[in-house]
C-alpha cells in the first residue's frame, strides 16, 4: 500500500521557493493539520540548511530507539549518492522520532556502513535513482506510514508528481515577487521534453495572517 502523499510548499506570488522571507511559524503551524507520519525532505534541502553543520567524522555508534507511543513523524531523506553526513545533527532535533535514508544499489558501501553506525534505517530501492513507489510501499509496510508530507524543492516535487505519487498539493503563497533573483520553482519537471499537463481539482483557499494565501488542490489520477 502506498501512503497518502501531500506536497506542501511556501512560494512567492510568482511560484519561487527562495528569494523571499518565508513565514516559518505560519508554515509549520499549518503543516500540523495533515497529521503526517513521515516527513520526506530532499537531500539538497538539508544540505542547504542555513546552519553551519559540520560533517560527522566520528566513529560513534548510536543505539537510540524511538518509543512506541511517540507520535512524532519520522524523517525520510533520499540520498542515493551518500552525500548527507550530518545525521548526528538531525537526530538531535526535536521534530522526528526516527530516521530513514532512501538509498539505491549504487549508494557507496562506506556510506551504508556509516548509516548503520548512526542508527539510521535504510530503505534500498532502484539502481541509480530511488524508486519512490517502492520506497513508499516499504515505508508503509515497515513503519506503518499512512501520510507523507513532502518538504522539498522543485526537483523532488517534480519526480513525485510525474510518477503519479502525489495526492494533494498545498501552496502557501507569500506576498512577494522574486522574478529573476531565484530560478527555484516549486515544480521542476524531470523531463521537460515529455512534459504534459497534470490535472488538479480545487479543494479550498484560506487567507492567513491577512497576508498569506493557502491554496489546496487534489491531483487527478
At which residue positions do the language-model features occur?
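Enzymes that bind and transform nitrogen-containing heteroaromatic metabolites
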Residues: 1-221
